[in-house]
Amino acid sequence: MNNKLEQFKKDVKNKRVAVMGIGVSNIPLIKYLVSFGVDVTAFDKSTEEKLTDAFNELKGLPVKYSLGPDYLSRLNGFDMIFRTPGMRPDLPELVEAVANGAELTSEMEVFLKLCPAQVFAVTGSDGKTTTTTLIYKTLSEEGFKCWLGGNIGTPLLSKIDDVAETDKVILELSSFQLMTIKDCPSVAVITNISPNHLDVHKSLQEYIDAKKNIFINQNENDKLVLNFDNEITKSFNYEARGEYVYFSRLNNINEGVVYQNGRIIVKKENSITEIIEGDKIKIPGVHNIENYMAATAATIDYVKPETIARIASSFNGVEHRIELVRELNGVKFYNSSIDSSPSRTIAALKTFKDKVILIAGGKDKGIPYDSMGEIITEKVKCLLLIGATASRIEEAYKNYLQQRDLENDIKIIHCDTYQEVVQKAHAEAEQGDCIILSPASTSFDMFKNFEHRGNVFKELVNNLK
């Protein structure tokens, strides 16, 4: 029996609970709380007309609702407030509620506090989803019963009654989720850190500090996996509470997971173990070699080396990450809608040997685009731009040319809709070309999320004649 869970159920039954947001991730949470008699009020800034699907999902359940633009003004009297990950914990209304005695928490915070199984968790600016998926697949292949959650999979608190002590839980955690987390995973992985989400975080330092919460309260028996090649994550070893392990594609470090002579190798004090040759990894790109190295460092104490190699040679990749959509008349279309930052787009473009037709742009989240000038010059033959960041991406490219006294030799096309951008990209393509959607920007100007953006792109591509 999970005594912590039973005590939580007993305690929360006597509380008034507010759940902020009636989105896909919170519906299972609301259903779960109601299932053992919790008094739940669901809050959302949208109106009932815009929440038809959610209301249908919750139909017949004893849930109260507080809706509309002023929904945050009605938090008085609640004992516990579940914030949605994208909601800053220092909003004045939340601060006031806490001052009045409310406990501010989240689905993930409660899950980590109550989970009986060992938890592996991954964060970072790039590579989170692929690395998390690799850890999940590797541990599953070894025979462990595994649960996948956080930013991917399904909300896990609603399934916690079924999680056993012998299971493994693998989580992808964003900086938003980590801002208020106190309970750390026993194996924490930070893939890399670069400026990101500065439209939500007040500064780069706040973003870094949020990422550090994944390990800052670990104990001496826990493990922290760090990227030696990233200056920010490399320095976190000084704050590690338990064991720390580096992975490095670029440096020959004495211990950790390294990439030497085209092979992923695990170096320990008295042993060297070869995992796999880089060219046998099925998904392309040096960034995916790094993702495998991070996953190897996280799992090597729990699985056989050949298990890692078997996954590496067979795993096709994650949807919306350099995903081949179709080939039409010799032109390949790739969907990499997950690429919401310049660093992700740079990594994606580096996987292609020849110059590509790039579709980029989206919502501006306040990060610099200077780094894109060089990669556009080297890897792009035609640039199609859309959204608020279109002019910033073009400016980064042209500034790069000007600083080096180079001439512009690529065609730049600005578009207003995704239908237009797909049609014009197709019109510019010749046999043998690759067209890739890699926005280097978030999706929220036109879409619900990056998955929605990627699915719209795929539908438009598949409708081309």
UniProtKB/Swiss-Prot annotation:
Keyword Cytoplasm (UniProt): yes
Species the sequence originates in: Ruminiclostridium cellulolyticum (strain ATCC 35319 / DSM 5812 / JCM 6584 / H10) (Clostridium cellulolyticum)
Compartments (UniProt record): Cytoplasm
Keywords, comma-separated and alphabetical: ATP-binding, Cell cycle, Cell division, Cell shape, Cell wall biogenesis/degradation, Cytoplasm, Ligase, Nucleotide-binding, Peptidoglycan synthesis
GO process annotations (BP): cell division; cell wall organization; peptidoglycan biosynthetic process; regulation of cell shape
Any one Gene Ontology molecular-function term assigned to this protein's record: ATP binding
The protein's name in its UniProt record: UDP-N-acetylmuramoylalanine--D-glutamate ligase
Lineage: Bacteria, Bacillati, Bacillota, Clostridia, Eubacteriales
Top-rank taxon, per record: Bacteria
Family annotation (Pfam families): Mur_ligase_C, Mur_ligase_M, MurD-like_N
GO CC term (a single one): cytoplasm
Catalytic activity: UDP-N-acetyl-alpha-D-muramoyl-L-alanine + D-glutamate + ATP = UDP-N-acetyl-alpha-D-muramoyl-L-alanyl-D-glutamate + ADP + phosphate + H(+)
InterPro entries from the UniProt entry: Mur-like_cat_sf (IPR036565), Mur_ligase_C (IPR004101), Mur_ligase_C_dom_sf (IPR036615), Mur_ligase_cen (IPR013221), MurD (IPR005762)
Family: Belongs to the MurCDEF family.
Disulphide-bridged cysteine pairs: none
Record flagged with keyword Repressor: no
Protein task: Cell wall formation. Catalyzes the addition of glutamate to the nucleotide precursor UDP-N-acetylmuramoyl-L-alanine (UMA).
Enzyme Commission code(s) on record: 6.3.2.9
